[in-house]
């Protein structure tokens, strides 16, 4: 029963977030009523507004190839059944969990004649975990296959398992409207400050069973790096290092964009950058002797059940031996390395009709380059440049009612470099009562609007204050 519960938890966690667009909500792009559209294209500014304040807002992204219906269903009125076999069939060779947070801290913008200026700050966290199919199989079947036949050697982990980055961003931008050409151009500079980073380069775990079943041996190897405020000490324990909070681990990025009002058509390229240069509190961690070997020859049942009761001391000893065996035992200082921020590409167009309706089309591409090394004095393999291009096309339809309520529905057609996904609905609500206070809620890249069938979602909500917003019931930007 315990094995089934553990396997069920792993199946639930096995995600494959489309892992894409984790800092973006594409429906914002063609609203023109929200300051957040300018975050995607520096040539965009809220329609009819002369000044705005962007108050703290929150965005969250999560993804999985498994919906609740893939592994759980109800039987009768009160019985919940977990179907692991059905869930296992839905998993691939590598299954990635993605979780992201995009917290808008504060922003403002104002117009001066044909120019406008913007400022924005935010906090971004991205977490990706890869769980190989072999690990889930091993938890469910142990050292046997699905038919119960013994497997002498089981590979349960192989490759990159974890990467996580948290950074702050401060951005300053400007735009200019060229009246004779009906063209607005914009640019933005960003300062990136890295707070914490952890990357696994290679993780291997192999379980070998002796021919006579007298012993099980686990051979483990790992190699990962940490940087920023959350580092490792010489004993391999995590330790906060706040003295490096305001020094090093930084980078710059640039956005450019343009909008042709007669179409209207627009394009933008965001995060042109080498990424974040991690150069403070960096540690490379690997087993001290090159690898770890753990042997288990069984446990005497009379020791475990001493006097008819479960002996917790025996179990605790086994647990401590396991923890001590896999604990990082070699920590080496690394000079520095770079971690790239994905570069985004946008090409959008919209058609406005009857003054209150808008149909929009947006192409969004994203180039992920991952981790790479500028220099490495200790010759530890930090990683190679791995370019991955993901893309999607979002079709949306919006209506502006009463000059203060905008409703948007859309769908994204997504390609992640390996497969194409045609069903990713989205929705948006923008309320601007009294044309001053604005509340927005956006959700897209949702695999289903029905909760038990949804595998992915991207939600963002927040508040803005607009001054000079008249609008006259129009959706189009004047």
Protein language model features and the residues they cover:
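Hydrophobic positions within alpha-helical membrane elements
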Residues: 7-8, 46, 276
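Outer-membrane beta-barrel porins/channels
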Residues: 135-478
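Short, conserved acidic/polar surface loops in the N-terminal third of protein domains
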Residues: 120-121, 128-134, 197-200
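Hydrophobic alpha-helical membrane-insertion segments
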Residues: 11-12, 50, 280
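Short coil/turn segments at secondary-structure boundaries
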Residues: 3, 91-96, 158-162
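N-terminal, post-signal peptide beta-strand-biased segments of exported outer-membrane/organellar beta-barrel
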Residues: 19-129
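Bacterial Sec-dependent N-terminal signal peptides
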Residues: 1-24, 349, 478
């Amino acid at each position: 029963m315990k094995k089934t519960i553990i396997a069920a938890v792993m199946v639930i966690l096995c995600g494959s977030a489309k892992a894409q667009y984790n800092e973006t909500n594409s429906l914002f792009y063609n609203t023109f009523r929200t300051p957040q559209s300018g975050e995607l294209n520096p040539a965009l500014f809220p329609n009819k507004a002369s000044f705005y304040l962007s108050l703290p807002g929150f965005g969250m992204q999560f993804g999985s190839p498994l919906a609740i219906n893939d592994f759980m269903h109800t039987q009768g009125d009160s019985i919940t059944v977990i179907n692991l076999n059905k869930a296992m069939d839905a998993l691939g060779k590598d299954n990635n969990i993605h979780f992201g947070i995009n917290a808008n801290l504060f922003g403002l913008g104002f117009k001066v004649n044909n120019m406008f200026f913007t400022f924005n700050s935010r906090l971004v966290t991205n977490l990706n975990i890869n769980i190989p199919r072999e690990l889930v199989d091993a938890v469910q079947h142990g050292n046997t296959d699905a038919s119960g036949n013994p497997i002498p050697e089981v590979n349960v982990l192989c490759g990159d398992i974890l990467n996580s980055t948290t950074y702050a961003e401060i951005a300053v931008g400007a735009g200019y409207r060229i009246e004779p050409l009906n063209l607005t151009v914009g640019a933005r500079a960003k300062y990136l400050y890295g707070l914490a980073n952890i990357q696994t380069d290679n993780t291997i775990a192999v379980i070998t069973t002796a021919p006579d079943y007298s012993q099980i041996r686990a051979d483990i190897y790992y190699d990962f790096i940490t940087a920023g405020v959350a580092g490792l000490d010489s004993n391999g324990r995590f330790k906060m290092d706040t003295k490096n909070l305001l020094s090093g681990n930084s980078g710059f990025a640039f956005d450019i964009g343009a909008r042709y009002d007669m179409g209207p058509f627009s394009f933008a390229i965001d995060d042109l950058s080498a990424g974040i240069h991690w150069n403070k509190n960096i540690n490379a961690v690997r087993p001290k002797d090159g690898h770890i070997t753990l042997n288990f020859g069984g446990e005497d049942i009379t020791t475990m059940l001493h006097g008819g009761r479960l002996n917790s001391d025996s179990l605790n000893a086994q647990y401590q031996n396991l923890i001590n065996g896999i604990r990082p035992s070699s920590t080496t200082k690394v000079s520095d390395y770079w971690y790239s921020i994905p570069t985004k590409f946008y090409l959008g167009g919209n058609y406005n009709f009857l003054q209150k309706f808008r149909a929009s089309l947006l192409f969004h591409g994203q180039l992920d380059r991952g981790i790479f090394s500028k220099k490495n004095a200790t010759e530890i393999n930090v990683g190679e440049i791995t370019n991955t291009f993901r893309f999607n096309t979002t079709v949306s339809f919006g209506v502006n009612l009463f000059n203060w309520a905008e409703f948007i529905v859309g769908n994204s057609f997504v390609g992640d470099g390996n497969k194409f996904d045609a069903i990713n609905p989205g929705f948006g609500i923008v309320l601007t009562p009294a044309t001053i206070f604005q509340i927005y809620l956006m959700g897209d890249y949702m695999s289903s609007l029905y909760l038990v069938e949804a595998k992915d979602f991207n939600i963002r909500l927040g508040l803005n204050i607009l001054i000079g917003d008249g609008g006259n019931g129009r959706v189009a930007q004047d």
